[in-house]
A protein has these predicted regions:
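S-adenosyl-L-methionine-dependent methyltransferase catalytic core, i.e., the SAM/SAH-binding region
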Residues: 123
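Charged catalytic cores and adjacent phosphate/nucleic-acid-binding surfaces used
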Residues: 1-13, 17-21, 27-33, 96-111, ...
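Conserved beta-strand positions in the central sheet of alpha/beta enzyme cores
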Residues: 44-45, 136-137, 161
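Short beta->alpha connector loops
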Residues: 93-94, 116-120, 140-144
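Short, well-ordered beta-to-alpha junction loops that form the rim of enzyme active sites
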Residues: 48, 92, 138-141, 199-201
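Glycine-rich tight-turn/loop motif centered on a GG-T
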Residues: 61-63, 108-114
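An N-terminally biased module of ancient metal coordination in phosphate/nucleic-acid-related enzymes
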Residues: 1-95, 205
């Protein structure tokens, strides 16, 4: 039995819609339908927040901002319920180009936590944990014009996005350099971090990346438990599939 057969429940953990992220091309409904057609069990909608490339007016009052910013998730969620795709709430936070994926929080929590808007990286970690979520460092070694420097915060993250399909998928036309993933995996190895895989997808032209499990997730908490507990799971960029345990032992080419 191959890895894909062992871990048949695939989740896109890094996805943007044009309703929350300025750089995305498609709505939540369109993304949900495309992911369902591609065989995903579920998706996390992880829009760029106010510190990143959001398309929502940052001057809006907090509750109104969160409501507008969550439209892509709402659209995907409504569609997912109709077509049989699990849709979970997430976020990609930005700090001068350094970005983090947040899992396990809800829109209601965000509305009730306005101090999150001005949180530092350290404060973000504390607040997210208080809200029952986790912080994953997104593509920590990506080099791009909007990232002035690579900054690592091992004490303020729960894990690392080790496989970002944008870096390694043959279908990707941006940020395409597998060395960024290799360095992220090496970083995870050195700190014994859990890893996630996602496509960082911005349109319905999917890469097929994601994190896969041997069971259907019951929700974001199950996702968190499944990657934090030491249980086996799989990571893919849509082309290659890896066992987490094997990836943690594989020496990486770093330059």
């Amino acid at each position: 039995m191959n890895i894909k057969e062992q871990f048949p429940y695939l989740y896109e953990t890094h996805l943007h819609t044009c309703q929350g992220s300025k750089c995305a091309k498609n709505t939540g409904e369109e993304m949900a339908r495309a992911c369902k057609d591609a065989g995903y069990t579920g998706i996390f909608v992880t829009e760029h927040n106010w510190g990143g490339n959001t398309c929502i007016d940052r001057s809006l009052p907090w509750k109104e901002f969160v409501t507008e910013w969550s439209r892509g998730y709402d659209s995907a969620k409504e569609t997912g319920e109709k077509i049989g795709l699990d849709v979970f709430y997430g976020m990609e936070t930005g700090f001068r180009g350094t970005e983090f994926l947040i899992y396990g929080i809800t829109k209601e929590w965000l509305i009730d936590t306005p101090q999150f808007r001005e949180a530092t990286v350290e404060e973000q970690f504390k607040l997210v944990h208080e809200g029952g979520g986790i912080v994953i460092h997104a593509h920590p070694y990506r080099e791009e014009f909007y990232i002035p420097e690579i900054r690592l915060f091992p004490e303020y993250v729960d894990g690392v996005e080790g496989v970002n399909a944008t870096h390694s998928s043959p279908l990707s036309v941006s940020h395409n350099n597998p060395i960024y993933n290799n360095r992220a995996i090496d970083y995870a190895q050195k700190h014994n971090f859990p890893m996630t895989a996602g496509s960082d997808i911005h349109s319905v032209n999917l890469f097929g990346g994601g994190t896969a499990f041997d069971h259907k997730l019951t929700g974001p908490k199950d996702f968190i438990d499944s990657i934090m507990s030491g249980r086996e799971y799989a990571l893919t960029d849509g082309k290659e599939w890896y066992l987490y345990s094997e990836l943690m032992k594989t020496k990486q080419v770093l330059d």
